[in-house]
Structures are given as structure tokens and as C-alpha cells.
């Protein structure tokens, strides 16, 4: 029987262990940031251990970065964590994309942008959205602080092999429907736990026609569907994205020859298989307190089916039967490791250009990295957003999570391009609605959600 992409990647990295038991995997790339690394570095010091492979470790600042003034850190814990990463990287010889550096940004954007993220690798990070890197034909998953220390010390990690799931996505995306809507649809349809215990491979005509940025959006939110990791087979789109980047292989022809073998064999079988038709999708909006609680734009919010729904409606200040258009928005956030890449900002700018943010809305655009910010400014996107009334910020995780000054006030509804809508995720009492960048941009200039498919300047589809 043939092998799946996941099988091939996993088998390449097993150092020790029997099938059905935890196995020791070699780690090709360890990405770190300021929040989950201090304890791990301190553990090395206490045991007087060196960091085994500083050349396979890369650090950046993202979670705690103040995006209005990156060097004005008021929170003492955040300041201490950032200073600790600077000290630790200097002491242990780790390359750091520091505050203000041209390489600084959200860790899951910096890896791909620098060419560190490549097909065939096992990539770990002390952050759950490490699944993003699977878009390159890699294994990427988040780890805890004790596991970060283990990787520091050994460049390996113990893991139980997940089962395999194949999600086949075919059909042309309709105008106004994006990669974000695909993953929101999957989670709304199958639930936040459907991927538990699985490594998910997304494939099919729709995936093949996507850019790397779109692919990263889908893999980024594999974790929201419960999966251990998400991945896609590498192809010419992947190879051209990696080519010429700072850490790309010196012999690209040789690398590509190997990467082309990273495909699921025609006679391979997944443990679970799902088929999806992308051509019938609509823009999605979440109404509740987990990503499963979402609906196509044309549908009303569902009836209460259990205590979780009842609690979600109470927290969100909404009722069954209402529609997305009726949500009283106060904030719009375009950013996060899900949707803060250049193509996301370009699509949002197309909608915003020549319009003004409504008076009831405070709108932020936070590029996911310094590279994206510089590229956006080089083509004038910053001016479009600023003239429309958006705040144009420095790169960082920003309003995706309530760990920095960018937070949504208590009881306020926010249209957000991020990945999680849990209670308090964007600040105490914040009410988060997950959408695509186009939907968020349109909400900002209309003062509420609208059917993005009726906007003339949008693209979407593939």
C-alpha cells in the first residue's frame, strides 16, 4: 500500500520508537518567541546544558509587541519577557529578529518569509498555530514550554503518531469567498473537535490553484478544527515561493528534486476522508464563542441546541434568528498570523480605497511582519488605509489576543481576521466575529457586516 504525505514526512524523522507507541522525532527547525521560551532557557541554565543546535533555532518578538509604539512597553511582565529573549538569544547563540528588525514579525510569518520554512521539515514552536507551516509540505505543530526545553537540549521531540485525514477540496471559489471561508466552513460543518487525533492533509483542485498565502491561512486554522497539524503537498507554487529567500537551499534544483517526492501516493489510504465543494460556499461570519459557531452570510443564527449555545448567545449579546448584518460592530481588526499577509492587505485596500471608516467603528490594520509592512508601504497601501480612517500599526500579534495593549473593550463587537473567538480572547468581555479580510474591510466602511459578494472591487475565488 502507498504512503500519504504525512506518512512520508513522519517516517523520515523517526529516530527511535515502535509503531503505536510514542516515537522520537528529529526537529529540523525550532521557532521561538518571547512568551513560551524563558522557562525553557532557564531550565538549560539550571542543568548546565548547552542549546544543542542554535543554527536550527530562530527567534522573534510578536505576542507582547506594542504595535502603536514598539519600543514603549508599559506592561512590566511583557517588558521582562522581551528583555529575557534578547538576553537568552545572545547567551545561547540564537539568531533573533529583534524589535524594529527588518525580519521581525509574527513567528508564523517570519519562518516562511525568510525561507526557513521548507518542504520536508519537522517544525515546532511554542505556539499552537505552528500548523501554518504545513502549507509547505512540512510537519508543523505547537509544543509546550517543557517540550521547548527538550528540543533546545536534544533537537528531538517525543510524539505519538496521529491518524491521517484527507480533506479533498474541489471547485472554483465564488467571487467574494476566500481561503478563510473554506476553513470556517469546515469547522462550522464538522465541529471544533473533528480533527482531534489527526494530521490533516488538504488537497484537490481548489488547493492547487491557491497562492502560498491562501494555503497558509487554511493550515493556520487546522488547530481550530481540533487537528494536531495541517499540511499540503508542495508543488511549483511552493518551490517558487521558497526560491531566492534568505535561507532557501543553495542548490534549489537538488532540493526540488527531493521535494517532488512529497506527495500522497495514488494507492495510499487515509484513516478518514472528507470531500468538499468550494464552488457553493458563501462568506462566513462567526456568531458565538468558538469557531464552530459560524454561519454563511445568508443564514440566520441557529436555535439554541445546548448549554454551550445558550452561554455563547448570552456572552455575545445576540439571539437566535438574528443575522450578521444586525451585529452592532464597534471595532475592526485586520491582522494576525491567519490574515496579515500582503495579499490580505491588498484585498482589504481594494475595498477601502476612496471610502471612510464609519464613525461607530475603530479600525486597525496590523501587518504581520516588518517585511509585509515595508512591502505594503512601497505600493501605498498604508496611505489608502490611513486616508480612510484606519490605524496603520507596527507588526505584531496585536488584537488577536489580549496580551498586549491592543484590546477590544468589554461588550464591544469586533470584526476580526484572526483565528479564535473565545470568551475574552481579544480582551475582557470582548465579542469577536471571525471573518475574511475583505469582510472586515467592508464592515469598517459600512459600519456593519455586508454581503461582500455585492462589492464591485473584490476579487476572491481562484
From Swiss-Prot:
Cofactor requirements of the protein: [4Fe-4S] cluster
GO molecular function annotation: 3-isopropylmalate dehydratase activity; 4 iron, 4 sulfur cluster binding; metal ion binding
Gene Ontology process terms (BP): L-leucine biosynthetic process
Keyword Transmembrane helix carried by entry: no
Keyword Lyase in record: yes
Binding site for [4Fe-4S] cluster: 337, 397, 400
Keywords noted in UniProt: 4Fe-4S, Amino-acid biosynthesis, Branched-chain amino acid biosynthesis, Iron, Iron-sulfur, Leucine biosynthesis, Lyase, Metal-binding
Pathway this chain belongs to: Amino-acid biosynthesis; L-leucine biosynthesis; L-leucine from 3-methyl-2-oxobutanoate: step 2/4
Substrates-to-products reaction catalysed: (2R,3S)-3-isopropylmalate = (2S)-2-isopropylmalate
Cofactor binding description: Binds 1 [4Fe-4S] cluster per subunit.
InterPro entries: 3-IsopropMal_deHydase_lsu, Acnase/IPM_dHydase_lsu_aba_1/3, Acoase/IPM_deHydtase_lsu_aba, Aconitase_4Fe-4S_BS, Aconitase_4Fe-4S_dom, IPM_dehydratase_rel_enz, IPMI_cat
Enzyme Commission number(s) from the entry: 4.2.1.33
CDD domains per the UniProt record, alphabetical: IPMI (cd01583)
HAMAP family in alphabetical order: LeuC_type1
Oligomer status and interactors: Heterodimer of LeuC and LeuD.
PANTHER family with a match to the protein in the record: 3-ISOPROPYLMALATE DEHYDRATASE, HOMOACONITASE, MITOCHONDRIAL-RELATED
Similarity comment: Belongs to the aconitase/IPM isomerase family. LeuC type 1 subfamily.
Reported function: Catalyzes the isomerization between 2-isopropylmalate and 3-isopropylmalate, via the formation of 2-isopropylmaleate.
Record-given protein name: 3-isopropylmalate dehydratase large subunit
Organism from which the protein derives: Listeria monocytogenes serovar 1/2a (strain ATCC BAA-679 / EGD-e)
Amino acid at each position: 500500500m502507498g504512503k500519504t504525505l504525512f506518512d512520508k514526512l513522519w517516517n523520515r524523522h523517526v529516530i527511535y520508537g515502535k509503531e503505536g507507541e510514542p516515537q522520537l522525532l528529529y526537529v529540523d527547525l525550532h521557532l521561538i518567541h518571547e512568551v513560551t521560551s524563558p522557562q525553557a532557557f532557564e531550565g538549560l541554565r539550571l542543568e548546565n546544558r548547552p542549546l544543542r543546535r542554535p543554527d536550527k533555532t530562530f527567534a522573534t518578538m510578536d505576542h507582547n509587541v506594542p504595535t502603536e509604539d514598539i519600543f514603549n512597553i508599559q506592561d512590566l511582565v511583557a517588558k521582562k519577557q522581551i528583555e529575557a529573549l534578547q538576553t537568552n538569544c545572545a547567551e545561547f547563540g540564537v539568531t533573533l529578529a529583534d524589535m524594529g528588525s527588518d525580519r521581525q514579525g509574527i513567528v508564523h510569518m517570519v519562518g516562511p518569509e525568510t525561507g526557513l520554512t521548507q518542504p520536508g521539515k519537522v517544525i515546532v514552536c511554542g505556539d499552537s498555530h505552528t500548523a501554518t507551516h504545513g502549507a509547505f509540505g512540512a510537519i508543523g505543530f505547537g509544543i509546550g514550554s517543557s517540550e521547548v526545553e527538550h528540543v533546545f537540549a536534544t533537537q528531538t521531540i517525543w510524539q505519538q503518531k496521529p491518524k491521517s485525514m484527507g480533506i479533498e477540496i474541489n471547485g472554483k471559489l465564488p467571487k467574494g469567498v476566500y481561503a478563510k471561508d473554506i476553513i470556517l466552513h469546515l469547522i462550522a460543518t464538522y465541529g471544533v473537535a473533528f480533527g482531534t487525533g489527526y494530521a490533516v492533509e488538504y488537497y484537490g483542485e481548489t488547493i492547487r490553484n491557491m497562492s502560498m498565502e491562501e494555503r497558509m491561512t487554511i493550515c493556520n486554522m487546522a488547530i481550530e478544527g481540533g487537528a494536531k497539524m495541517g499540511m499540503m503537498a508542495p508543488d511549483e507554487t511552493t518551490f517558487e515561493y521558497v526560491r531566492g529567500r534568505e535561507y532557501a537551499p543553495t542548490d534549489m534544483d537538488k532540493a526540488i528534486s527531493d521535494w517532488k517526492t512529497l506527495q500522497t501516493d495514488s494507492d495510499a489510504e487515509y484513516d478518514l476522508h472528507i470531500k468538499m465543494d468550494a464552488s457553493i460556499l458563501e462568506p462566513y461570519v462567526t456568531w458565538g464563542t468558538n469557531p464552530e459557531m459560524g454561519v454563511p452570510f445568508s443564514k440566520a443564527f441557529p436555535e439554541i441546541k445546548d448549554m454551550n449555545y445558550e452561554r455563547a448567545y448570552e456572552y455575545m449579546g445576540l439571539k437566535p434568528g438574528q443575522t450578521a448584518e444586525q451585529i452592532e460592530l464597534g471595532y475592526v481588526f485586520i491582522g494576525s498570523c491567519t490574515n496579515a499577509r500582503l495579499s490580505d492587505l491588498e484585498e482589504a485596500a481594494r475595498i477601502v480605497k476612496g471610502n471612510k471608516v464609519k464613525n461607530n467603528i475603530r479600525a486597525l490594520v496590523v501587518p504581520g511582519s516588518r517585511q509585509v509592512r515595508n512591502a505594503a508601504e512601497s505600493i501605498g497601501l498604508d496611505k489608502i488605509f490611513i486616508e480612510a480612517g484606519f490605524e496603520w500599526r507596527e507588526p505584531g500579534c496585536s488584537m488577536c489576543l489580549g496580551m498586549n495593549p491592543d484590546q477590544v473593550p468589554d461588550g464591544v463587537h469586533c470584526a476580526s481576521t484572526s483565528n479564535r473567538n473565545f470568551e475574552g480572547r481579544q480582551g475582557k468581555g470582548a465579542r469577536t466575529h471571525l471573518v475574511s479580510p475583505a469582510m472586515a474591510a467592508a464592515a469598517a466602511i459600512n459600519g456593519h457586516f455586508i454581503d461582500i459578494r455585492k462589492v464591485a472591487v473584490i476579487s476572491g475565488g481562484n
